[in-house]
């Protein structure tokens, strides 16, 4: 079983406001992504930069994903589904908060009205979710019920890392604490109580990282395919575990160097063991 993990595309129509040339770069990624031969592609959020306030950008992201002709499961990030009224007030264009049920948000209308999605792949389950601060959509109890209903190994797909990926942080908003602090803590507690959750696949921080979440679960981030560090993950799953590898995309190889030019390439692209290895379950 092969799973392709991409994240943080940050799609916006050309000519792009944030990163000129981004869509051309993403289009150069199309053929390499198809050649992976994935049974499923997971997309761990921030499909857009301005989608929370400009739903037509979400439609463009869906068009791009559909055009790959690879089965996929996508979840929203903070730029697709504003995480809280506070974030919406701080960033009304990039993280607009929609005080409506999930299914009536721009993301829900574009990608599906259910914030929890399941794909059954033989002896493996893939569960994706979109979450907002204080869980107005009731995602956490749904997840608990879904995870408890089956004993097969689970790859859980969300947007926000639940434990730090780099220390020290290059910026106060590096990580999830500024976005979903209470809900993130509750989600981490939930995962630690569910021994069948073997991998938590996420994005958000634009780095390639691997961190333990619990004795039974590992957190893996993919870089930002669109804005950098432009990487994607390939997971080969068998009955005893998962082998992970990392490939470079066509976009920039770094993102946080604009904040701190002294950051190493390893900060963005990960160590050797973060880029490839095996997880046993």
Residue ranges and their predicted role:
Residues 1-58, 148-149:
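N-terminal active-site segment of His-dependent metallophosphoesterases
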Residues 1-13, 123-132, 155-157, 217-224, ...:
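Active-site-proximal beta-strand elements of phosphoester/diester hydrolases
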Residues 8, 41, 46, 61, ...:
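Divalent metal-coordination and catalytic microenvironments
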Residues 12-15, 49-53, 74-86, 115-117, ...:
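Active-site environment of divalent metal-dependent phosphoester hydrolases
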Residues 56-148, 215-218, 234:
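Extended active-site neighborhood of metal-dependent phosphoesterases/phosphodiesterases
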